[in-house]
């Protein structure tokens, strides 16, 4: 026979008013915080990814694909010109 762990049953937690008062505020705030993180551009700065308008320059409009795996340094320098 199994014993009890002393924790509250999940059904009691989900049906409590306190649970829904707390989570009705925190869950939407997580989505708002994520939206602000991305929409302000902070995500680009934190993770170091280029912004959508920085992928292509006026001089280079083709995809920067490396074709020769042994001369990658030279190819990257050509892409950065």
From Swiss-Prot:
It is a single-pass membrane protein. It comes from the Bacteria. With its partner (PsbF) binds heme. PSII binds additional chlorophylls, carotenoids and specific lipids. Its main location: membrane. The chain crosses the membrane at residues 21-35. The keyword Metal-binding applies. Heme binds at residue 23. InterPro entries: PSII_cyt_b559_asu, PSII_cyt_b559_asu_sf, PSII_cyt_b559_CS, PSII_cyt_b559_N, PSII_cytb559_asu_lum. The keyword Glycosyltransferase does not apply. One of its GO terms (biological process) is photosynthetic electron transport chain. It is found in: Cellular thylakoid membrane. Its cofactor is heme b. Keywords: Electron transport, Heme, Iron, Membrane, Metal-binding, Photosynthesis, Photosystem II, Thylakoid, Transmembrane, Transmembrane helix, Transport. GO terms for molecular function: electron transfer activity; heme binding; iron ion binding. GO terms for cellular component: photosystem II reaction center; plasma membrane-derived thylakoid membrane. Heterodimer of an alpha subunit and a beta subunit. PSII is composed of 1 copy each of membrane proteins PsbA, PsbB, PsbC, PsbD, PsbE, PsbF, PsbH, PsbI, PsbJ, PsbK, PsbL, PsbM, PsbT, PsbX, PsbY, PsbZ, Psb30/Ycf12, peripheral proteins PsbO, CyanoQ (PsbQ), PsbU, PsbV and a large number of cofactors. It forms dimeric complexes. Belongs to the PsbE/PsbF family. This b-type cytochrome is tightly associated with the reaction center of photosystem II (PSII). PSII is a light-driven water:plastoquinone oxidoreductase that uses light energy to abstract electrons from H(2)O, generating O(2) and a proton gradient subsequently used for ATP formation. It consists of a core antenna complex that captures photons, and an electron transfer chain that converts photonic excitation into a charge separation. This is Cytochrome b559 subunit alpha.
